[in-house]
Amino acid sequence: MFINEYFHNIDSKGRVIMPSKFRDEIGEEFYITKGMDECLFVYPVSAFIQMTEKLNKLSLTRRQARAFSRVFFSGASNQEIDKQGRFLIPQSLRSYADIKKEVAIIGVSNRIEIWDKEKWEQYSNDSSLNYDDLADGLNDLDL
C-alpha cells in the first residue's frame, strides 16, 4: 500500500526519484497516466491491469466511457526505475499536470499520484477540503 507524501526535483531530462519506500511495492515496471485534479496517476502493473479490466467492461455505446478510456490509455506510459532510483515522466504528461521543477509524490492506497509541488500545496491547504465534511459525504460507505 502506498501512503505518505514526498517531494523531489525533476532533472533536465524529466526524471524524478521514486521514493525508496515506494520502490519495492511499485516493482521494476509500472504505468503512469493522466489522473484527475491535474495530477498524474502511477499504477503497479497489477493495479493497471485491474483498471484496464474494469474499463473494458464499460459499454462502448456510452460516450463518457469511450472518452474516459481514450484519455486514460492515450496518456499512459510504461516506465521502469533506473539504477539511481529515477524514472521518466514523459513531456506530454508533465505538460498535462503542469509540472515544473518540483513534484509531490503522494501515496494513495493502491496508486501513487504525482503533482506539481505548488499545486499540491494549494490543494492540500484548500479550506474547502475540510476532512470532516469530506468524511460526512462518505456515510454510505460505512467507514
Curated annotation (Swiss-Prot):
Forms oligomers. Residues 5-47, 76-119 form the SpoVT-AbrB domain. The lineage of its organism: Bacteria, Bacillati, Bacillota, Tissierellia, Tissierellales. HAMAP family: MraZ (MF_01008). This is Transcriptional regulator MraZ. PROSITE patterns: SPOVT_ABRB. Disulfide bonds: none annotated. GO terms for cellular component: cytoplasm; nucleoid. Coiled coil: none annotated. Pfam families: MraZ (PF02381). It comes from the Bacteria. It comes from Finegoldia magna (strain ATCC 29328 / DSM 20472 / WAL 2508) (Peptostreptococcus magnus). One of its GO terms (biological process) is negative regulation of DNA-templated transcription initiation. Belongs to the MraZ family.
